[in-house]
């Protein structure tokens, strides 16, 4: 650990560092990040790019009295280091270890938990208004990336900031502009910021012009006053749109986001401003590590890697579900010109980069805008196209109203491909995909499927793209399950697949948890039990004919799902049995009413009781 960094053990210790040594401290922090994240994995590039911004905030502010909200939160590692948590970095994103995002229960310096995009300005505004109501004078800051500004919630908050301008109350927004979210940014805001980057600093320009005019004998001050009165037209001339100032937010920029002294000057000046102010800082994602600078997308979120080469320590040997989705969609689109693909700023994560390569005119990246993406897809479907929206399960939550109102009520053929469904591992509570059955399974007209393995997935996709109505397929993060490939009954609407006939108990497996259920069956067989096993396939509509057969045959029915039990598949089966006056014993296994913290997927399954050993044990306990 670096000599300077070793002196920082508590919040505000950075203030004891000599200002002339700030650049040295920045180097030590980057070295610390590389040493640790290369071993644990995590979000690297964004943190390397935010070192000086975070240092400047901790130099200018006092924690925990002052409040900083980090949008998305994956760039908060430096904040954690500077608030006394650096010794815990060996546990980053591991079970019972340091969280990869701000977490209120972890430190009082983490004033607001984040994980999803575009929330920081709203949260910071709430903190600022509460401050003013309590007549306090602490500083409130929102740190937001240029990618997050493509999210509609950010604009709603910017619009609402006028309440602070009216009262002349301070709040600082730092725009960390690195031209990227995870992938390169798209859309009008991206073009607007690109235009700003190409121009001289507006703040510097304004000050220099006013100073020069004031020094002209006789007429200078008069001209300066006239210029001030017509500042709106001057701004429009030199900075097209002046979006932020037109919304009542003072714009300060451009600032070099890697010049610690320039940042300190900007923040100290912003603290004195009456009203909301935005500091536009230009940064480089992956700054200080050549491998990340060259490929910031790869190092956005990465597993353990070799620091010298930048190569992952554990090389991918199997195809992932995302890979299978990507290859299948490209193949299906070859003979179906109506297939179009949509992503919300995640072409790489969702596997749509290959689709973009082959069918660029049928590919749409709408930015961080899930609500818009769903209704945009609905519009495409209304005109005869067959849109495929590939999205992470935890992010589709943001488009719930649009799924219900704009797609399902109108029975429009939108295909939702829900990646990262189920347990996702190290990203923790904010990214778990354990609610999609609950928030989609109750919507009329929605069809919801889950493949048991990689072989079944393309067949479900083919079925979905021939289906004339709303349909969704959920699948997990990680390598495909290759077992049970000999079981490949045709995919039919609302029909499940019987894997094993049995006698004592039947297990209904939802999706890729089949891997654990098949192992559990083997454990039970070894102990003398005769379990049946069913691949549910269709969560909605349920295979009611098969359920009647199972209820007549098996005294114990077990459902297993990587979903919250409340509103999950098990409750659907329970409702069916009750409605039809069956009295079978029902055991539902899944996530039992808690947010799943960061750990490995295997550890999370064990905690939930849905690993093979736990499933078998629960069944034996229930039968005895």
Predicted segments with their positions:
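Peripheral docking tails and interdomain loops at the edges
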Residues: 304-308, 312-317, 425-427, 446-447, ...
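Cofactor-binding active-site loop characterized by glycine-rich and histidine/acidic residues
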Residues: 43-167, 321, 339, 343-344, ...
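Glycine-/acidic-rich phosphate or pyrophosphate-binding loops and their flanking alpha/beta elements
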Residues: 265-268, 300-301, 320-335, 351-357, ...
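N-terminal amphipathic, basic-rich helices that act as targeting or association modules
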Residues: 1-81, 245, 249-263, 280-283
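Structural signature of the thiamine diphosphate
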Residues: 223-291, 413-418, 437-486, 612-624
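A glycine-rich helix N-cap at a beta->alpha junction
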Residues: 88-98, 163-178, 201-204, 408-420
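Non-catalytic terminal/interface segments that mediate subunit docking, oligomerization
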Residues: 67, 283-397, 402-412, 469, ...
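Long, well-ordered, tryptophan-enriched scaffold segments
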Residues: 4-5, 178-325
